[in-house]
A protein has these predicted regions:
Chain A
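Glycine-rich, Arg-bearing micro-motifs that act as flexible, cationic patches
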Residues: 109-134
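Short, flexible loop segments at boundaries between secondary-structure elements
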Residues: 138-144
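Short secondary-structure boundary segments
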Residues: 37, 113-115, 144
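Structural beta-alpha unit
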Residues: 1, 75-110
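Small/aliphatic-rich secondary-structure junction motif
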Residues: 2-53, 86
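A short acidic, glycine-rich active-site loop
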Residues: 54-69
């Protein structure tokens, strides 16, 4: 059975560094990659009726955008390097959804970049990598 | 285009207000007779003893009882499942990003939790005595079943537009449901009738009544009808309110709507918490207040028409507040993409519960305990929201101010929701086009302003009449389509039981 690595990706530089780092590891151990793009979304927000009616369209657009602008180009460059790559786009709480996806794909490890925010900012807005480290049942590699 | 419409709206209002002094009064004398006549037609009454039972109220009560029994007390047996659905236990993570059950519920609730919960209850208690509260709760309980049926149908028969958005609601299930049963012509007729009704009704219950009561409370906290500089400036308050509403629904300034939608749930909680505090500050009046509710319900002491009079008032105000039987929530719930229409019906059960059984009852107790502790407090000519405000002020003197703010927020969010309901009726009739959209929205804003210029009595008559008028075709359709809902419901719950429909979380 091939090993699977899950890579959290959002198009930022940090996430690309994480993806590159994961690719090196995957090549070395002939593992395959799952690139996961999580769109921050909560089922408990409050919407106007008009927003609800248009929600399905918006969702399709969001997924489409993540797929074509981030996942497709990135996964292509890794495929060219000879690594097996699958992609996932999902809505939800970033860290929670990454853990769910890792479980679904039976991933052995999660790779994630970090933004390197100041302590104040992290205190205010939290950090996906930090939360993920606390929640994940499998090893997490945080790539600076 | 937007600007032109906005400008036109402003101009017409400005020129009207230019006649200045006594303008509010002129509007009043103009509208009062129309309202009175319209109310008489819709509320055709059958005299029973001293009481007069409006046919339409009977129609709603019989419907609610029928659906409760026919659906096997779905309002009780579906309750736990409703909470599980809202909590997201059955939500497939692959569908994350679509409208969740919670969101559909929250949207529908912010449409129903409005001034009716604060001011409408006071009206019920003034006219129907404390006993009206009992019937209000009863109506809420039975209304849960009606809501279940209409919201299930709304999802089942909605239209999916080519662009991926959805339109649903009674006009769609009436048309499609009847034509499925071979009554195409009749289906088209009632569908259109409903659409017209919701267009007009939206201008009353979801609009003028809201802006009027928000204004009343505003005047109240700025010094009362005698002192406040705003007392005879209904047109000014109305124009401001209309402009804010216009900026959201016509101008597309989503941020205002978003802020409101976020504030309203907290306002509702804030309101309930303070109401409970006020009730408990009068703790020695609580047993008597509760006893009054029960004895009032049975004897109807001091109420025109006795117990029956109290019942009629209670039911009337309950429907006005939770909208069960009107079909409006069904429009909001149709936006949820689900393979199981029944799930939306089950979730919608919670709306009359939250709206009527929880919030209205709390308001009734605030007034009830105050009335026990100080019998004459409300006899100073206070009506509607002013009475509720007075009951709060007895214990917490500064509360009318946050109450005014809450009232404005409630009014505003209800108006936003109803502008959508009305618009859906309008587009059903005239097709989905931007120009048509804008025309309706402009009319809607005009009525927001108008609502602040007329007195409560005629407003209640008009809005009640419009709203109750559309209950007639809606409930008629529900009777016809109830067997379909029943079949779907049984199949759905059987699959839950057999484990075919599984929970994703909390297992």
């Amino acid at each position: 059975m091939t090993t699977t690595y899950l890579v959290a990706i959002d198009g930022s530089e940090g996430s690309l560094r994480a993806a590159n780092f994961a690719t090196e590891r995957a090549k070395a151990s002939s593992a395959k990659l799952v690139l996961a793009y999580v769109i921050e979304w909560s089922p408990y927000s409050f919407n106007t009726p008009e927003e609800n009616a248009e929600r399905h369209q918006r969702r399709e657009e969001e997924i489409e955008r993540a797929q074509t602008t981030v996942l497709d180009p990135v996964s292509q460059t890794f495929r060219d390097k000879g690594v097996g790559v699958a992609t996932e786009v999902r809505h939800g709480h970033a860290a929670e959804t990454l853990v769910d996806l890792a479980k679904e794909h039976g991933a052995a490890q999660i790779f994630i970049g970090r933004k390197g925010e100041s302590r104040m900012k992290t205190l205010l807005f939290g950090s996906v990598a930090g939360t993920l480290v606390q929640m994940s049942p499998i090893p997490v590699t945080v790539v600076p | 285009m937007k600007r032109i419409l906005l400008a036109a709206l402003m101009l017409s209002l400005m020129s009207a207000s230019a006649h200045a002094a006594g303008f509010d009064e002129t509007i009043n004398t103009m509208t009062a007779p129309i309202a009175e006549w319209f109310g008489k037609v819709v509320f055709f009454k059958i005299p029973i003893g001293d009481a007069a039972l409006p046919l339409v109220v009977l129609w709603l009560v019989v419907g609610a009882i029928f659906f409760t029994v026919y659906m096997g007390f779905i309002n009780i047996r579906g309750f736990k499942h409703a909470i599980e659905l809202v909590r997201g236990d059955y939500a497939n993570p692959k569908d994350a990003g679509e409208v969740s059950h919670f969101q559909a519920l929250a949207t529908a609730v912010s449409g129903t939790v409005g001034i009716g919960n604060i001011g409408g209850v006071a009206v019920a208690v003034t006219v129907g005595g404390p006993g009206a509260t009992f019937w209000l709760i009863m109506a809420g309980f039975l209304g849960m079943s009606t809501k279940f049926v209409e919201c299930t149908l709304g999802v089942k028969y909605r239209n999916e537009n080519p662009d991926g958005s959805v339109s649903g609601g009674p006009m769609y299930y009436l048309r499609k449901g009847f034509s499925e049963r071979g009554m195409e012509g009749f289906g088209k007729f009632v569908g259109a009738f409903y659409a017209i009704g919701i267009c007009l009704g939206a201008l009353g219950i979801g609009n003028m009544f809201q802006s009027n009561q928000a204004f009343v409370q505003f005047v109240n906290v700025t010094g009362g009808t005698q002192e406040s500089w705003f007392a005879d400036k209904g047109w000014l308050f109305g124009i401001v309110m209309a402009l804010v509403v216009a900026s959201v629904i016509i101008g597309g300034i989503k941020s205002i709507a978003r802020v409101t939608e976020k504030i309203v749930p907290f306002m509702a909680i804030f309101y309930c918490v303070f109401a409970l505090i006020v009730i408990f500050m009068n703790y020695d009046a609580i047993p008597q207040a509760i006893a009054n509710i029960f004895t009032g319900a049975m004897t109807g002491e001091g109420v025109v028409g006795g117990a029956l009079g109290a019942l009629i008032i209670g039911f009337q105000r309950a429907v006005f507040s939770n909208e069960a039987g009107i079909g409006s929530a069904s429009i909001a719930h149709s936006a949820v993409r689900t393979n199981e229409p029944v799930t939306e019906g089950v979730v919608s059960l919670l709306e009359p519960f939250i709206d009527t059984i929880v919030i209205c009852t709390i308001t009734a107790l605030v007034i009830g305990t105050a009335a026990v502790a100080e019998p004459g407090f409300a006899l100073v000519g206070q009506q509607g929201i002013a009475m509720t405000s007075a009951a709060f002020a007895r214990e917490i003197s500064w509360f009318p101010i946050p109450l005014a703010f809450a009232a404005m927020m409630f009014a505003f969010s209800t108006m936003i929701s109803w502008s959508y309901y009305g618009l859906k009726g309008w587009t059903y009739l005239f097709g989905e086009s931007q120009t048509m959209d804008r025309i309706y929205k402009a009319i809607f804003c005009f009525f927001v302003a108008l609502g602040c210029m007329v007195q409560l009595g005629p407003i209640l008559d008009i809005s009640d009449a419009f709203v109750f008028l559309i209950c007639v075709p809606n409930i008629l359709g529900l009777y016809f389509l109830a067997p379909i809902v029943k079949r779907e419901t049984e199949s759905y719950f059987a699959r839950i039981k057999s484990g075919e429909i599984k929970k994703y979380k909390h297992t």
